[in-house]
Every structure is written in C-alpha cells, then in structure tokens.
Amino acid sequence: MSPEAVSPLRRRMIEDMTIRQFGEKTRRDYIRQVREFTAFLGRSPDRAEPEDLRRYQLHLASLGASYARMNLASTALRFFFHVTLGRPGFGDRMARIAEPERLPVVLSPEEVALLLAHAPGLKYRAALLLAHAPGLKYRAALSLAYGCGLRVSEVANLKVADIDSSRMLIRIEQGKGRRDRFAMLSPDLLDLLRQWWLVKRPRGWLFPGQQPAQPITTRQLNRACHAAADAAKLDKRVSMHTLRHSFATHLLERKTDIRVIQVLLGHRKLDTTAVYTRVALKAIREVTSPLALLAPPPPS
C-alpha cells in the first residue's frame, strides 16, 4: 500500500477520534490495529471486503491471540469502517469474543505488608539521609496503589498538588473514562509521602521519571512491583493492579458499603465493583457448614 493511500486515511481516522475525545492510548491502539490489518491485507484498507475481516479474525485466532487482543481489533476496525470510511454495518461479520470471567488475584494483608517491605532498594533504611532513595520511592508508589485503590496509570500521573493534606484527600484527575474523583488519604500514607518529598522534593510530578519533566512510566512501576513480589517470595502473580484488587477486597471484608467502594475505585457501574464479592472470602470462612450441624443418628 502506498504512503499516499495511507496518510489521508490515517489523518482522517485521527481526526475522527480527536472529535470524539478519545484518550491518547485508545488512539494509539486503534491506529496500530488498523496498521496490522493493513499489513495482513496487503493493500489499502479502504479496498477491503467483508470477507477480509472474517479472514483476519481467523488469522488472529490461529496465532493464539488473546480475547482482549481479538476484541480490540474488532472494536478498532469497526470504528475505522463505520466512522472513518462511512460504511455502517461493514464490520458486522467480525465476531465479538466472550471473555471468560476470571476472579482477580488478591493478596492477604500479610502478603501486602511483605510486598511493601521488599520494595526495590528498601534495604536503605536511612533513606532520608540519601540523595537517592529508590526503595522509598517505590514503597510510596506501591502504598498508593494499595492504600487508595489507584490504577497504575493514576499513580504514575499524580502531581504533588494533587495531595490535599488539609482534607486528607488525593485528587485523581482524568482517571479511566476521563472522570475526576477523590481518593482517601490515610495519616500513615501521608507520612510516607512526606518522607519521599523530603528526599526528592519533586515539584511537578509526584514520581518523576528518568526525565524530570515526565512522570514515571507504568512499566517502571510494574517492574518494581514484580521485583518486590519476587524478593518477598510470593507465589501469586502480582502486578500493580493486584494491589487495587486487594484494596477493594479488604474493604469489603471489613463490611465497607460496596457503593462506597464503587466511588473510591471510580467505577461507573456497581456491577464492576460486585466482582469483589466473589473473592471477599472472610464471610465464606465464617459460615458454618450444614455438615457440621448434623446430629449423629440414634443408636439402632
């Protein structure tokens, strides 16, 4: 496909997404999906036929693509054909793959404490005396994910000005779904953040990246989380999002109203929050099995 054929289409698709105020990540993902479909097709995507979309899905399935990957391709290509090319119904032959319902991985409070204690670099206990305290930085970041139930992108994009110590709140700007919200700020977490600020004295981003003008990346945070889990010898698959899952589950096990948890997590629908009722196991463990209540039969 010639650059002359691609460039106008890509530009128009970007404009269509800009008009609809799609997030930067969504725009990148959609462009990449159309680019990969074009490479498979071997010609300009505006010359595609409905059967080509079906063949492409079959191609992805043969490669072992995940449910999320298959559905992202379907959503992006539907947008491209329906909106950018003005062909409503063109992508109807693309199947929507039903994702299996998997329970989130949740750490126990003891495992969370162990994870935080093994944040990379935390062996430097006199962190406040050091010019660089990587352990304090990552412990603060991981503590935010667990203590406030934040997504990894929300931790990465926090600014110093978002910490409202007078009201004990953290402002989350433009979280998922481009909605602002407030997260709770505990005294212990505030103390930890103040320790971090005294060491680094960040002015803009709370956790600056390698380039101070840019925030830390989500990849860096997840790597730090994986390193802490390995050092703590946890046998579960742990990521930054695991800390968010654990936050919600532990609140639910302490009988916090699920609607309050919904607000803290920034969920639009209560159904999304309700998944944690399936992993909040304290109530299940406290139930007495009917087997234990059976009386022995009278002697014959």
What do the PLM-derived regions correspond to, one by one?
Residues M1-S300:
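Conserved catalytic core of the tyrosine transesterase superfamily
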